[in-house]
Design a protein with these regions (language model features):
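A short Gly-Trp-Pro
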Residues: 1-9, 14-138
Length: 138
């Protein structure tokens, strides 16, 4: 049986990342960083093992999200299209060995429904949907 392949593409199509296999974590996040990264009320993040990345194509740029604690390593390194600015993926110190991919950038096949919501204490008060069967943390 062949493993499922997911491909995330930026808005202009110049950059992409391809991974094999299902995500290790598939979550909605309500933290301020994800809200700012997406320009939305939450971020959809699919985390895959680093070894599952099979291809990255395009002229990427990076932005390092600094820690608020002096001398501490950066929180995240975000990787985005150098042409249109779409954030496609990132590496986070909190998820060693995993690469986070923006769920909304994956078109076909469609990612399964997120199974968890995190940082719920920062969720917008008007946002009332519930993920059926999902665990909720923080």
């Amino acid at each position: 049986m062949n493993a499922i392949t997911f491909k995330a593409t930026c808005c202009c199509g110049a950059c992409s990342i391809t991974v094999n296999g299902p995500p290790a974590i598939n979550a909605l996040c309500h933290c301020a960083h994800c809200k700012r990264r997406t320009g939305s009320a939450f971020g959809w993040s699919a985390y895959f093992p680093n070894a599952s990345v099979t291809a990255t194509i395009g002229a990427f740029r990076t932005y390092s999200v600094p820690s608020k604690v002096p001398g501490e390593e950066n929180l995240q390194e975000r990787v985005f299209c150098g042409t249109c600015g779409t954030t496609l993926f990132w590496r986070s110190r909190d998820f060693a060995g995993l690469i986070g991919i923006a769920g909304g950038c994956i078109a076909d096949p469609v990612l399964p429904e997120p199974s968890i919501t995190v940082m719920n204490e920062e969720r917008c008060a008007w946002l009332t949907f519930v993920i059926v069967g999902a665990g909720a943390t923080g």
